[in-house]
Amino acid sequence: MAPNPRKSHPLLKMVNNSLIDLPTPSNISAWWNFGSLLALCLMTQILTGLLLAMHYTADTTLAFSSVAHTCRNVQYGWLIRNMHANGASFFFICIYMHIGRGFYYGSYLHKETWNTGILLLLTLMATAFVGYVLPWGQMSFWGATVITNMFSAIPYIGQTIVEWAWGGFSVDNPTLTRFFALHFLLPFMIAGLTLIHLTFLHESGSNNPLGIVSNCDKIPFHPYYSLKDILGLTLLLLPLTTMALFSPNLLGDPENFTPANPLVTPPHIKPEWYFLFAYAILRSIPNKLGGVLALAASVLVLFLSPLLHKSKQRTMAFRPLSQLLFWTLVANLLILTWIGSQPVEHPFIIIGQLASTTYFIILLILFPITSALENKMLNF
């Protein structure tokens, strides 16, 4: 019998082991769809981004008008731009859901997969930030100024780092040029990291909602989960295209319809919605260095998840107290997101400080305590 090229060809064999004959737990729910949705988001962003880059000019005098030109004069340029801008929002929705799933079901106990995932999140955040600057609108410019300026809080070398990043003494043409270069490069870095992420995942195999070893009950990825993923893709593309076609500017900032002007500061500088929770944590601390450290900690705290896992059970499926705490954390993050979009005024300041404090308390203190308590209640 002739060998099956799918199983013998060096390249096809890799595809086969990752997407066709991959042994997959039979009970994984729709929460396991977000990995493939993120892959779809990445491919969509790279494709639309490439088409946009063909019409974009990375120069302070031309950037804004080149984006306007793309929307007005390029065939379907408006659609490409709207898909790219809103695709970023859906990318973040998917990655936050994906992280939430990992946290809820104890997937972080696959340490290498979890840690590469956090690196992917950080790279995605960097990509989104530099991309937001490219249209050179008011909020693009001032967002770039405020966020890059945070590095000046680093003792001794901070100011030098900021001026080195800017390529001068303020955000200007060199900054825009290098941000465009970075925005082009980073998605390919994300693609590379994704392969590493998957390599680590396929070492151990997927977790499942029960958190138990499922080696005795695995099914092939294709046709079962390939079909399930296609359903997920259509359900993601539907709201994305709807948004791009009907309300493309819903999540954008109106300030970005005004070209960047270094002489006029917008009344309220804020990043895109997906960074607001971290921005609220940054603002809740009156000290500059303290705020920057809290901002970094808000994401880097995820690295500690495997170390803070004290429960004898892997998932939260049968741990009602931890479930309550988890959804409190979700509500807390939504409050932080709302606070980040509000001006720095009386009720919002104290709410932001309380929400920031509870965010860290829940993650670092309450989760381990609750897990230990549940162990005791179950006589583990």
From Swiss-Prot:
For heme b b566, which residues are the binding ones?
A: H98, H197
**Cofactor binding, note field:** Binds 2 heme b groups non-covalently.
Its needed co-factors are:
heme b
Annotated residues for binding of a ubiquinone: H202
Question: Where is the protein found, in the record's own terms?
Answer: Mitochondrion inner membrane
Keywords for this entry?
A: Electron transport, Heme, Iron, Membrane, Metal-binding, Mitochondrion, Mitochondrion inner membrane, Respiratory chain, Transmembrane, Transmembrane helix, Transport, Ubiquinone
Q: Which domain of life is it from?
A: Eukaryota
**Residues bound to heme b b562:** H84, H183
Q: Which residues cross the membrane?
A: 34-54, 78-99, 114-134, 179-199, 227-247, 289-309, 321-341, 348-368
The record's comment on protein family reads: Belongs to the cytochrome b family.
- Report the protein name in the record: Cytochrome b
Q: Which organism's genome codes for this protein?
A: Hydrobates pelagicus
- The gene name reads MT-CYB
